[in-house]
Amino acid sequence: MVTLSFFDVFLRVYAIINSHARVRQILVKGSDGLVTAQAPGKLYIAGEYAVVETGYPAVIVALNQFVTVTVTKAEGIGRINSKQYQENSLTWQRNGDEMVFDNRDNPFHYILSAIRCTEMYARELGRNLSVYTMDIDSDLDANDGKKYGLGSSAAVTVATVKALDQFYDLHMTKAQLYKLAAIAHLDIQGNGSLGDIAASVYGGWIAYRSFDKAWLAAERREHGLSELLSMDWPQLSIELLQAPKDMQLLIGWTGSPASTSRLVDKIAIAQAKERVEYQTFLSASKNTLEGLIEGFRQQSLSAIQAGIRANRQLLNHLATLTGVEIETPILKQMCDLAELAGGAAKSSVLAAVIVALR
């Protein structure tokens, strides 16, 4: 029997997550207008490709590594700073309700989209907009800016919305926060399930089904944000799960993060040519994920491990069907070693491998 020393093959182990992990909330809005908000990164446990389709389930876990956004009231000129992009700090001013930037060539697209959507919502609620300095720090990217593939763009979107929610006293519920952050993120990425947004908002383990994005696009042409945030979104489902107490989750990183949006695009192009086979994959994924989710509900580690193994097989079939490499050689090696040690393992969007152990 291989001992747990096999995990030395992992280039990086991020976390051992207990089933009670939750989003760290902020705390107090100071008299100087300072607000700090945090949102965690995420990892898809299973269902990461099928969940892009409306109503198909995935299991996602929020991590104990965070993006932190701090907003401080300023006079005249505001700034947006990030430790990951120190050379690209933005300065801005107000022209009425508009933000006017000194330069537009910047890496802050998700942050700016989150600001735009949250301030649009704030204006609908009658709030007066202010000038402020925003500082961003992240545990989810390396110091050189390399992404670990843990949902940093979603986390920074959520943390920005949360901070401005506090700053403008908007009192959003988690459901409203999810919907507003999802809109802001979708405006930039253009595709995806938005499950990473849900994980960053709710924390812990969740079972997630995506909403109908065509419905949302149509409704946005007819309704403002305050109305959209109060609506029931078709097919959207977010269920909090509890992991068995005897289960450990280990996460290994290959050192080669993947672009989620590009992978989704490649899968979409390929599945258009293989419609029947792709529908078969979706049906099998749904059945597998429903069994996996029931394993969490019943606190059955064996059922969870069986679901992870079945999902790995489905992803390998999807790779054959589409020609998209999902389980790279190093990921295969990591998964196989995990199985030898008594765990259940699969890849997660090329960048990491997850292992469920007793």
Residue ranges: model-predicted function:
Residues 10-12, 16:
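Short, positively charged and aromatic/hydrophobic N-terminal segments
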Residues 21-22, 28-46, 50-52, 60-124, ...:
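C-terminal nucleotide
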